Amino acid sequence: MSLFGFFKNKGSATTATDRLKLILAKERTLNLPYMEEMRKEIIAVIQKYTKSSDIHFKTLDSNQSVETIEVEIILPK
């Protein structure tokens, strides 16, 4: 990849996909009471900008100290 290609605009589909990928990680040892509230707020913001109600949270591979959550958003056509 050349230096000039680095600044080239991505296609809109690629940009949209990148923006919709969201990974949350929390430490299991900390019992954070605001995680569920934060999850609800994230859903509200996503719905505000995408008008989508098809939002799923998935727990990905976790180790003992970190749990990773992926947010999947199905956009309406």
From Swiss-Prot:
The biological process GO terms on file are: cell division; regulation of division septum assembly
User: Which superkingdom heads the taxonomic lineage of this protein's source?
Assistant: Bacteria
Q: Name one Pfam family in it.
A: MinE
- Which keywords, in A-to-Z order, does the entry hold? Cell cycle, Cell division
| Cysteine-cysteine disulfides | none
- Asked if Cytoplasm is a keyword of the record, the answer is no
The answer to whether keyword Cell cycle applies is yes
Among Gene3D superfamilies, the record links this protein to: Cell division topological specificity factor MinE (3.30.1070.10)
> InterPro entries recorded for this chain?
MinE, MinE_sf
Q: What does this protein do?
A: Prevents the cell division inhibition by proteins MinC and MinD at internal division sites while permitting inhibition at polar sites. This ensures cell division at the proper site by restricting the formation of a division septum at the midpoint of the long axis of the cell.
Which HAMAP family does this chain map to?
MinE
Q: Which family does it belong to?
A: Belongs to the MinE family.
Task: Name the chain's protein.
Answer: Cell division topological specificity factor
